[in-house]
């Protein structure tokens, strides 16, 4: 089975904890001396879920007790569509949002990721509801919005996994016949984020490039390949000489620039998606002109956990909040 659900009566003591504990027992993950489960049941598993109707939580087979989460939104359904007579339960929301057949198949194909931990363990990651909803809305805009309205700002609070949301968008594009010829440019402002983004997007079958210099970035933007480029924001304006000086002082976030070069028009295609991480930072507003000029017809989506008016002014209205 793709999904294993443990259902508990809501009136027993701690039904959610008992349901999760039983899921762990079925998988032989409780550390018992003798085998107590049937791990073969989970060989093809994508989601495990514990529910007692009023509370419902899910995780992957590698998740610990603390990793079980609520699916709090049934998007694209409205809550009133699920239960017209009142507020739907957590179980009803999760079933409509995750387990409706087309949603579940979409999640399995486009929203499951894997991460290698430093300990050597491979962790299976399942999406959170805001990641699924945000990626879904971005894809819908790419497909259906008029020119000039396809981009915008995605406001998800800190810690909600915006990097994974970007990866889910890319994977869904790759698996969509009408979107898999896009070029994707991912822009970050820290080296650790650039490395994280590169590792994360390697799970997608696009060719992945890191822009190592301003000239390298220009060449990657110019080419017509449907690929993914990961670039630091300073590549859109700072001279390499000044960047080298500051790298000796600081290897993390950017410092204030002293020299900004002007980019020419590099690619006029309208099949370019630019996704910008932490787009509320001042660097993006200062260098936005070069982004716009180098790819004048591209779709630009800003990801932020701290929205400010200037972000919306630069990148467009809210796609999801």
What are these regions (language model features)?
Residues 191, 211-219, 233-238:
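Conserved helicase motor
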Residues 39-40, 178, 220, 263-266, ...:
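A general structural signal for stabilizing positions within well-ordered secondary structure
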Residues 91, 119, 185, 209, ...:
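Short, functionally important structural connectors and interaction interfaces within domains
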Residues 205-212, 275-281:
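Short, charged, low-hydrophobicity "junction" segments
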Residues 1-188, 192-207, 224-227, 234, ...:
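ATP-dependent helicase/translocase motor core
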Residues 216-229, 266:
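Conserved motor-coupling elements within RecA-like helicase/translocase cores
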Residues 35-37, 212-217, 260-262, 285-289:
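Short beta-alpha junctions and helix-cap segments that line functional grooves
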Residues 16-19, 23-30, 61, 69, ...:
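Signature of the SF2 helicase/ATPase Hel1-core->accessory helical subdomain module
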């Amino acid at each position: 089975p793709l999904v294993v659900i443990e259902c508990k009566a809501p009136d027993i003591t701690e039904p959610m904890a008992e349901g999760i504990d039983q899921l762990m027992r079925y998988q032989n993950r409780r550390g018992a001396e003798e085998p107590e489960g049937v791990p073969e049941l989970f060989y093809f598993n994508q989601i495990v879920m514990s529910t007692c109707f009023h509370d419902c939580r899910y995780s992957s087979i590698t998740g610990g007790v603390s990793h079980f989460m609520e699916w709090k939104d049934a998007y694209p359904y409205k809550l009133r569509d699920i239960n017209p007579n009142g507020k739907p339960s957590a179980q009803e929301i999760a079933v409509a949002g995750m387990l409706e057949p087309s949603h579940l198949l979409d999640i399995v194909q486009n929203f499951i990721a894997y991460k290698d931990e430093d300990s050597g363990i491979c962790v299976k990651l399942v999406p959170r509801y805001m990641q699924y909803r945000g990626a879904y809305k971005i894809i819908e805009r790419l497909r259906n919005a008029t020119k000039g309205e396809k981009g915008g700002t995605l406001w998800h609070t800190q810690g909600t996994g915006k990097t994974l949301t970007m990866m889910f968008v890319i994977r869904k594009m790759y698996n969509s016949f009408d979107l898999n010829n896009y070029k994707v440019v991912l822009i970050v402002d820290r080296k650790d984020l650039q490395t994280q983004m590169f590792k994360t997007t390697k799970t997608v079958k696009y060719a992945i490039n890191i822009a190592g210099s301003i000239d390298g970035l220009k060449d990657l933007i110019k080419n017509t390949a449907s690929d993914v480029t990961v670039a630091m924001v300073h590549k859109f304006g700072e001279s390499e000489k000044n960047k080298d000086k500051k790298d000796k002082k600081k290897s993390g976030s950017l410092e204030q620039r002293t020299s900004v070069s002007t980019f020419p028009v590099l690619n006029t295609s309208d099949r370019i998606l630019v996704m910008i991480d932490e787009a509320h930072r001042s660097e993006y507003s200062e260098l936005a002109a070069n982004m716009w000029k180098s790819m004048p017809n591209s779709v630009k989506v800003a990801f932020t956990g701290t929205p400010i008016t200037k972000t919306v002014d630069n990148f467009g209205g809210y796609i999801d909040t």
